[in-house]
C-alpha cells in the first residue's frame, strides 16, 4: 500500500 510521507517515518505500520 502507498504510505506517502508516512513511509519516510517509522510511524507507518500497515
Curated annotation (Swiss-Prot):
The modification Glycine amide is found at residue 14. Expressed by the venom duct. One of its GO terms (molecular function) is toxin activity. It comes from Conus caracteristicus. Probable toxin. Keywords: Amidation, Disulfide bond, Secreted, Toxin. The cysteine framework is C-C. It comes from the Eukaryota. Disulfide bonds join 3-7. Its main location: secreted. The lineage of its organism: Eukaryota, Metazoa, Spiralia, Lophotrochozoa, Mollusca. Negative results: does not modulate oxytocin (OXTR), vasopressin (AVPR1A and AVPR1B), NMDA (GRIN1 and GRIN2A), muscarinic (CHRM1 and CHRM3), and nicotinic acetylcholine receptors (alpha-7, and alpha-3-beta-4), and voltage-gated calcium (Cav) and sodium channels (Nav). Amidation at Gly-14 does not impact activity, since a non-amidated synthetic peptide shows the same absence of activity than the natural amidated peptide. It is found in: Secreted. GO terms for cellular component: extracellular region. This is Conotoxin Cca1669.
